[in-house]
């Protein structure tokens, strides 16, 4: 629809946002494999290993850029910053793509790697990366089975994310690949955490390189905005 709207001569710009959450959603092997197969189809890349998946994601990243995209958006429970090796991530991909369930440690390592890769992609194109974090989802099993995901049974989560957030941002910054960033918390107890975190990674290259996002979801109301 973005392409059709642009080609129609519509004067208002309607630009897409890159939202690759499913590429790191490895909790359910069948769902992940289904996503990878769809990614292969739309990208035209045959995917049989981790490097293939990244190549396909880069191709889609390029496509979104061609459509005017300048923002990525990542919906995460918390920040992930586990230590990992390339060999570990490739092995984890092979395991989950083959249908085997991952351990909690493997899930966290994979998510940590993907966040860094996405951040590097955005830096290469000068995009801004956004993170909406802090929700716990699908809390009512009965209603989840009846209606599915995203049907009103999500709430504010309570996570200890300051260290992981700092480590993630520092990884990109240390490698000279920390792009413009906006952080949106869902739990108001993290307001001061983010407000102070911003100052750690401002580098003077542009005003407000790392920013506190506006009140989101449950905080998108008068009290939430004033506290922020």
Task: Name each region found by the language model.
Residues 1-12, 34-180, 189-207, 224-227:
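Histidine/acidic residue-rich metal-binding segments in metalloenzymes
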Residues 15:
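His/Asp/Glu-rich acidic catalytic environments and adjacent acidic regulatory segments
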Residues 18-20:
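Short amphipathic
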Residues 22-25, 217-221:
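Short, conserved secondary-structure transition motifs
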Residues 25-28, 35:
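A conserved mid-domain beta-alpha-beta active-site/ligand-binding segment of alpha/beta enzyme cores
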Residues 180-184, 212-213:
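Short catalytic-loop micro-motif centered on adjacent basic/acidic residues
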Residues 187-189, 218:
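Short beta->alpha connector loops
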Residues 208-217, 228:
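Generic long, charged, amphipathic alpha-helical segments
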